[in-house]
Amino acid sequence: MNKKVLKTLEYDKVKQNLYAFTTTSMGKRLIDKLEPSSDYDEISNSLAQTKDGADILRIKGGIPVPNLISIKSFLKRLDIGGTLNSKELAAIGRVLRATNEVNRFFKDLADNKIKLEVLFDDVAKLESLPEISKKLLVSIENDGHVTDDASTLLKSIRQQISVTEETIRERLNAYTRGTNSKYLSNAVVTIRNERYVLPVKQEYRSKFGGIVHDQSSSGQTLFVEPAVIVELNNRLRQQQVAEREEINRILEELSKELAPYTHELNNNAKILGMLDFINAKAKYAHSIKATEPILSKENDVYLRQVWHPLLDMKKAVKNDIMIGKDYQAIVITGPNTGGKTITLKTLGLVQLMGQSGLYIPAFEESRIGIFDDIFADIGDEQSIEQSLSTFSSHMTNIVEILKGIDEKSLVLFDELGAGTDPQEGAALAISILDAVGAKGSYVVATTHYPELKAYGFERPNTINASMEFDANTLQPTYRLLIGIPGRSNAFDISQRLGLDKMIVMAARQLTSQDSQDLNEMISDLVAKRHDAEEKEIMYRKYLREAEELHHDLETNFHQFERQKENMLEQAKERANQIVEETKKKSDELISELRKMKMSAASNIEEGSLIDAQGRVNALHQETNLKKNKVLRKAKQQQELHPNDDVMVNSYGQRGVLLRKAGNHAWEVQLGILKMKIDESDLEKIKVKDTQPKRAGAVLKSSSSSHVSPTLDLRGERYENAMVKVDRYIDAAVLAGYNSVTIIHGKGTGALRTGIINYLKQNKAVKNFEFASPNNGGNGATVVYFK
């Protein structure tokens, strides 16, 4: 990337903004080296790092990288056997401490299943060096102070120094607090030449024995070391020398122990600097509300609602800028001060940011290209500092640009062809654009020459554009209008500002009809565009409301489905419960019938059997009769009369009404029996449904004639077979069989196993066994009842 365009587009100002978010000198050095890249993989990896940093900033508030200085020069000294001072060792200690903290931080991210694209791999390269790290951190504090724990000898020497200093202070306090204090300029103990002294007034020098070490600038105060503490000061000096010697020994020892790890320490410092740099990119992106760009290898640029990164997002006008897909050249026409130059700079600088791995100031889903180089000729005539730009300097720059461009270049021309005769300037501008197009480069050019308005219509892969101007307020809106060439507003502005109408009309007549027609066409296009934009806003609103309604309906539908499933589950549970209760009662009744059968030898009295059968039927009727309001109401509304044929629901038997037996009861003839039945248990039968009654019919227990002593299930599906077994066992018990045979076949054994499990749970079954070999063996089971 050519260096000139970085200066022209103020790339360094973006880097200056990044500096504010760094905490290490290594991170600042990476910003110094930051430049746009044209390598897809390099840009992609850099953006992935920025994304990881942005995710960490959002979730955890950033990567914990503290203030660190570069240790590169310190490590070089260690490589040649040098000894570092305590502050230099402290700087290395801070790097090791930061390394440990960063390792813990990323381990916590991993434990919490936080997903990152690249940083886990980068951080895995950090070397903790636990042993030397622990020793260094114990021996040297952050500010470079060597701690008492650095060695036993150092701790002992410092204890001796403390005792000696305390003794000296006690001796001197006798002077500062007693009657001798009047001889002192100040009643304080001070130090001169590393020895404790007293500030004695000049005239009382003879009152004190000892050594004079210094005097005040006025000569009125002498700093005297009293004779009584000379020996103590000498002892203190010896102890301080011993302390320095021990500290130097400790520093030398630590330096030697660190020397083998200079490569690891240098690598750690680089990674911490990189993390600081990533932190800065993420924080800068957050500060300007930037988003992650999509990389387009085809250089299909689409910046959605982009704004200049050096402008306040809240105040800057946002524009959609597109180039590369449908066209490779944009010609922005129209008068000055409309925002053409800032639009050019925005496109160029945002493209540089994206190719540097930075987030861009645009809405999400914006795309940037990957250009090998970006060229710009922007004189910025609106800037006072650049007001000396001339046609010659512009043309010199353009000549250099044309030499360096190819199909992977983006070229930005501001006021192309300006600074010379308008007719010649327009012709030059057209020729230059043709030359750029011939090399396949992407180009955006601004101009105020009306001749270039037709260029976008005549040239392939080229489109016109303009900066919107509000005719009502006579102010530019700074909005980019792709597809609409700029129009002159001079006549309208002049008339609004008070220029005589006749003068304006005369001026219009002096312009060509084609020019007037073009301006009217442009005005019509602008009006239609405004109408389309308003409709788009309205349709987007309708779409958003429809999407919200769809979401609500979908949510309610899913909620309804969940409620339905819950109700079905509850109903199934209740049904299963009822079935279990019913089966239990049925088993009890069947057992009772067997006892009755056994006690009666062969026949069961009709009344007992009917009563038992009625109780079985009642099990099936109970729930329905209680819950079915329609059936209850129908029963209440039916009119019963003597001699009516009725169904006794609880017994499942037909009968004939004889007479009323109370408010809600009837005497009913059931076979040879007469029974009193509650009216709610009776259901009137229509005459056509009845059959001729046989008088004196006797109900016998010999129902065994209708039940076979053998049940053959061969060829049946498992589910159907188990249902038949259940029904068959009940029927066999009611029929009074002592034993029956169930033929299930051998097959896979699944049906046999299911039948055996069923028989084990059936209370009416006494025991069971496989049939004899000549009667089917384990392909048939003989069941014995209680």
Curated annotation (Swiss-Prot):
<dbReference type="GO" id="GO:0006298">
    <property type="term" value="P:mismatch repair"/>
</dbReference>
<keyword id="KW-0694">RNA-binding</keyword>
<feature type="domain" description="Smr">
    <location>
        <begin position="711"/>
        <end position="786"/>
    </location>
</feature>
<dbReference type="InterPro" id="IPR000432">
    <property type="entry name" value="DNA_mismatch_repair_MutS_C"/>
</dbReference>
<dbReference type="InterPro" id="IPR045076">
    <property type="entry name" value="MutS"/>
</dbReference>
<dbReference type="Pfam" id="PF00488">
    <property type="entry name" value="MutS_V"/>
</dbReference>
<dbReference type="GO" id="GO:0019843">
    <property type="term" value="F:rRNA binding"/>
</dbReference>
<dbReference type="GO" id="GO:0004519">
    <property type="term" value="F:endonuclease activity"/>
</dbReference>
<keyword id="KW-0699">rRNA-binding</keyword>
<dbReference type="GO" id="GO:0016887">
    <property type="term" value="F:ATP hydrolysis activity"/>
</dbReference>
<dbReference type="GO" id="GO:0072344">
    <property type="term" value="P:rescue of stalled ribosome"/>
</dbReference>
<dbReference type="InterPro" id="IPR036063">
    <property type="entry name" value="Smr_dom_sf"/>
</dbReference>
<protein>
    <recommendedName>
        <fullName>Endonuclease MutS2</fullName>
        <ecNumber>3.1.-.-</ecNumber>
        <ecNumber>3.6.4.-</ecNumber>
    </recommendedName>
</protein>
<feature type="binding site">
    <location>
        <begin position="334"/>
        <end position="341"/>
    </location>
    <ligand>
        <name>ATP</name>
    </ligand>
</feature>
<keyword id="KW-0067">ATP-binding</keyword>
<dbReference type="GO" id="GO:0043023">
    <property type="term" value="F:ribosomal large subunit binding"/>
</dbReference>
<dbReference type="Pfam" id="PF01713">
    <property type="entry name" value="Smr"/>
</dbReference>
<keyword id="KW-0378">Hydrolase</keyword>
<keyword id="KW-0255">Endonuclease</keyword>
<dbReference type="GO" id="GO:0005524">
    <property type="term" value="F:ATP binding"/>
</dbReference>
<dbReference type="GO" id="GO:0045910">
    <property type="term" value="P:negative regulation of DNA recombination"/>
</dbReference>
<comment type="subunit">
    <text>Homodimer. Binds to stalled ribosomes, contacting rRNA.</text>
</comment>
<dbReference type="InterPro" id="IPR046893">
    <property type="entry name" value="MSSS"/>
</dbReference>
<dbReference type="InterPro" id="IPR036187">
    <property type="entry name" value="DNA_mismatch_repair_MutS_sf"/>
</dbReference>
<comment type="similarity">
    <text>Belongs to the DNA mismatch repair MutS family. MutS2 subfamily.</text>
</comment>
<dbReference type="GO" id="GO:0030983">
    <property type="term" value="F:mismatched DNA binding"/>
</dbReference>
<dbReference type="InterPro" id="IPR027417">
    <property type="entry name" value="P-loop_NTPase"/>
</dbReference>
<comment type="function">
    <text>Endonuclease that is involved in the suppression of homologous recombination and thus may have a key role in the control of bacterial genetic diversity.</text>
</comment>
<keyword id="KW-0540">Nuclease</keyword>
<keyword id="KW-0547">Nucleotide-binding</keyword>
<dbReference type="GO" id="GO:0140664">
    <property type="term" value="F:ATP-dependent DNA damage sensor activity"/>
</dbReference>
<keyword id="KW-0238">DNA-binding</keyword>
<dbReference type="Pfam" id="PF20297">
    <property type="entry name" value="MSSS"/>
</dbReference>
<dbReference type="InterPro" id="IPR007696">
    <property type="entry name" value="DNA_mismatch_repair_MutS_core"/>
</dbReference>
<comment type="function">
    <text>Acts as a ribosome collision sensor, splitting the ribosome into its 2 subunits. Detects stalled/collided 70S ribosomes which it binds and splits by an ATP-hydrolysis driven conformational change. Acts upstream of the ribosome quality control system (RQC), a ribosome-associated complex that mediates the extraction of incompletely synthesized nascent chains from stalled ribosomes and their subsequent degradation. Probably generates substrates for RQC.</text>
</comment>
<dbReference type="InterPro" id="IPR005747">
    <property type="entry name" value="MutS2"/>
</dbReference>
<dbReference type="InterPro" id="IPR002625">
    <property type="entry name" value="Smr_dom"/>
</dbReference>
